[in-house]
Amino acid sequence: MKLSRNTLAVALLAALVAPAAHAEVALDVIGNSEVSFEGLVQADFYKFDTDTIDYGADVPGTDVDGKDSLNELRRAELVLKGKGPGNIEWVLGYDAKDDKFLDANVKYKFGNNANHFIQVGQFKQPGATMEELSSTKNNDFISKSSITNSLGTARRVGAQYNYGDNNWGLTASYFGRELTRNREHGAGYGLRGYYAPINEAGNILHFGASYSDKDTDADGIRLRARPMADMVATRFIDTGSSVTSANTLNNRSDRVSVIGAEGLWVKGPFKLQGEYMTIDVKRLNGLSDFSGDGFYVSGLWNISGETWGYKAGTPTTPLPNDPAKGMWQLGLRYDTIDLNDGSPIVGTNRVNGVLGGKMDSWTLGVNWYWRSNFKFMLNYVMVDQEKYSTTLRAKQEDNPNVFEARMQFYW
């Protein structure tokens, strides 16, 4: 679904004149369950300072308009939630833009303790990043980090058990495929543990670790990363799609394991967080195993003075102190991912192992949360990408810069 500039302008005007609303809409009490309705709508615009690739193409090789830009609806999430009867909670979410199910699960809280529960259905796995486990509407930057998008395991159907308290927690899950048809497959399990030795208002220190192990889908996996712009079709960093070549992971790959480490520090209006992930792919028929990794470090400053909260091992974003003026944030992130595990064979057009490429990026961002339901984001992203070409027998580079804007309405 494409949005014209006129449509985006109308959406902005509607956001400016709409009255403030609550964070969720209470619907009814059905079967002793308090049912509420939530939603999230995001519209994105990208303008590319291209290097070698036209990222303005909706489909690679089909864009001939000469415009290095994209504008489109990013998310249109509709979510029903229920509390009760008793200690039961449930959720059913769907993204009408991406045509996929979101969280769709039932949770039972032991002793009505939010930190001690069992959950069945589709949910974000403990093998995801802390960034992924946080609410999407409060992400610090328009694009999530490369390890979140490329290495972590997000939503899958399964069961998990969580035990903890306000400042620590342990989670274990077993999962299968994603609920939506033709999405992620491969059964596995995930673990996450976290501890916050300091957990006070405006003063938080958090450490965490995660592990996941899963089967591949039909003995293949494809790891790739977009240039910090979620809607582009072309991905320069890519371990390949061939189902016959030994130099891609899309064949003869048996199991995948990912280890993650995370840290968070909040002091008043300042937040510093970072995450690291390393991935190992066990290969078949004598092929060498593959290893890759990545990390990000980000800092955020609430210019208007608000601070963050803490829940379930993730930071929570506050409402503006002054709804009419809103909450202003300034952020900076460094991000890197390395999908190279091999080397060229000198004098030939062949390689040992898999050379998917390496990407580094810097993102500078400004966010404005207005009242209770609106958010506007501006990002400037500088990307450096490098990958070995067997055709050229040399490394290729693609180093675009991207201006990104997002308008968001949520309730």
Which positions does each model-derived feature cover?
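Domain-scale selection of a single, long terminal region
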Residues: K2-A9, G186-G193, N199-A218, R252-K271, ...
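Short hydrophobic/aromatic segments of transmembrane alpha-helices and their interfaces
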Residues: R5-N6, E72, L151-G152, G357-K358, ...
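N-terminal low-complexity, intrinsically disordered patches enriched in charged
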Residues: A18-A20, F48, R283
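Outer-membrane beta-barrel pore domains
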Residues: A26, I30, T52-I53, V64-D65, ...
